[in-house]
Amino acid sequence: MRKVPEVLPHDEHNAALIANVHPPDWTNPEPAPRYNLVVLGAGTAGLVTAAGAAGLGAKVALVERHLLGGDCLNVGCVPSKSLLRSARAFADVRDAERFGVNVPKAPEVDFGAVMERMRRIRSRISAHDSAARFRDLGVDIFLGEASFSGPDTVEVGDTTLRFKRAVITTGARPVALPIEGLAEAGYLTNETVFSLTERLGRLVVVGGGPLGCELAQAFCRLGSEVTLVQQSPQLLIREDPDAARILTDALQRDGVRVKLNARAKKVSVSDGEKLLHLEVAGGEEVVAADEILLGAGRAPNVEGLNLEAVGVQYDTRKGVVVNDYLETTNKRIYAAGDICMAYKFTHTADAAARIVIQNALFLGRKKLSALTIPWCTYTDPEIAHVGLGERQAAEKGIPIDTFTTPLAQVDRAIADGDDEGFVKVLVKRGSDTIVGATIVARHAGEMISEVTTAMVGKVGLKTLATVIHPYPTQAEAIRKAADAYQRGRLTPRVKNLFSRWLEWTR
């Protein structure tokens, strides 16, 4: 069983966090004779499953070996977004002169205070995921290592929990990339980077996915020299290439050195500094750093669960094998969240947990594939997406029409000085059925839900053109894309008919 990192530093905020999500004085309850659900893992999927099932009257046990709240609360969404907000505050002051505001001297970052703020926010939010709160919701909380011991039993230390159904929600963890010398040199991951108390002079981020891009921008704005290394030809390989280009330009303006088509070959140490050797076009390049942060590489937490004993198939890279109903190969056992799903987001774990509750407790047949899943990368600007992109539509052989509104044509974006970005909506050719959208804007994550709602409700782009948006808002870009669809329907023949009618009625 792997050793989880210690929560550092030892201050009042982390003490409050631990008191909520892994109380040192916690006593596991006496187990019930039998549970409707035993949930293994108290990240987002586990917490939502446990609370939802208990709220419906089920007898539920929830087992967690480390910290309730999982990655999202402790080493993911919450601390990273706190850091990003501080970084954005710095950038706003830095760029204030663009708005006619003169700052007497260059803004300075107190990195220790930034991290202290993050820990304070995290401890405050942790009350929502606390052991005491879930106990009061009617969930039996067991702190300890869990493993299956029989067809309907789970062992937690010396305690046996008997279940009718079980749910595996143990999540995933960062893993070292196969880079020669990396382990010996040492590296940071999302599990350790938020324990920093002093600013890094030089940071290399390996991996240009969401985490890598977000933290590269944050640390650069907070005063570190940052190099972002990506093996593929674009950042955020899953995203629209136009969106990735805008983000690359934004990162470079902030001072991030972006290295695309660069493969990390090995790490060496010389005179106390870490040297990352890159394979790039035309040869090799060496980047010196104080620390290396891995922004790529995840592995499912399947070890120690004794899944073989209950016939649950799994892959050490992809996780627990599930069908569209989130059933494992043992029909009494389900899984949800990062342990089994390709889309490793907090909100998809939440949605999957709701599917599990219906299917495991009420003979439901809710399908994972029926979900419409948006996501957002919280850089500045943000990149939000839902449904298909142009590449995915082409791969699936789906003919599409694309309607794009540059933010440079949106009054609020111009007034805010945030006019770099766009709204791009894809519809099935010959119809107004929305199949996907990408938004690049400072608050794209807040905007994408309008398109997601339309897709879930089967509302076409034509209808969005009739929705009155307050003026001025950046969300008007969505209506403008819908207006472009409407104009496309005005064929020469229709326009000629309109002209003849108007001439006749003049």
Regions found by a protein language model. Name each.
Residues L47, C213:
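Residues forming the Rossmann-fold NAD(P)(H) cofactor-binding site
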Residues V103-P104, D140-L143, S147-E155, L222-D324, ...:
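A Rossmann-like FAD-binding core segment of flavoenzymes
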Residues A50, A54, A216-R221:
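Gly/Ala-rich phosphate-binding loop of Rossmann-like dinucleotide-binding domains
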Residues V38-L40, A146, L161-G171, V205-V206, ...:
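Short hydrophobic core segments
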